Amino acid sequence: MVNALTNNKWESIPKENLQLGAETFAYETGLYETFRTLNHHPVFLEPHLDRLFNSAKLTQLKIEYTQQEIWEMIQEIIEKSPNPNQRVRILAVPKKLILYTSSLELNNLIYKGVSVITVQTNRVHPEIKTTDYRTCLTAWKSANDSRCFEAILIDKNGILFEGSRSNIFWIINKKLFTRKKDVLPGITRQTIINRSSFPVEFGILKKSGISKIDECFLTNSGSGIIPVTHFNGEKIGNGSVGEITNQLLKQY
């Protein structure tokens, strides 16, 4: 059971009812946000709430609470947990707002470089974090079955968009690139775009062009920057974390 704050009241919810993409998930229509805490402090909470409310407008989902009220609820659930570093989930579904936390356990080996694969899939409303997570979950399971950290979603033309749980950046000739549109406006992604000491350009990368990139990394709110050293079984660069990626890791 998960101890959750539902419409500002505590209740216990079966864990399987909160697992996005699972057949047991209880809320097919809705939105979600996930962010982390660092020493009991929420990281980038404001942009996460901004994105939640913007998505609610786009999907015409009514959220009964203000951002300030949600912020206060989040403070309550964070303080209730003994873990200083937590993963916080917001579920906004018809007539309900559900907040809960879980312990954030990161494997530091990922920062030495991970392997990813490409998975072709049809993507619907990628710019919105909806609770209809089945497409991304299926892609992620393909990666997991291949003993890879992440699945990079591509279309029928072999164009890369983003990961099932992340955004993607690549580096060619010391220039930093990412997709401009048709991807989730990730919070960590936007932080890199806004604050990186390296200028970011928007571009398109095809599966056939992966062998030509020098470096690659993923971003998400839980893990931050994750270097990619192998793509579809092939090395990126020399197969180790690249110079620019290393500098960004230190800055982040």
Positions of PLM-derived features:
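Ordered, amphipathic secondary-structure segments that act as subunit-interaction surfaces
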Residues: K80-P94, I98
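Helix-start/capping segments and mature chain N-termini
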Residues: M1-E76, V93-Y252
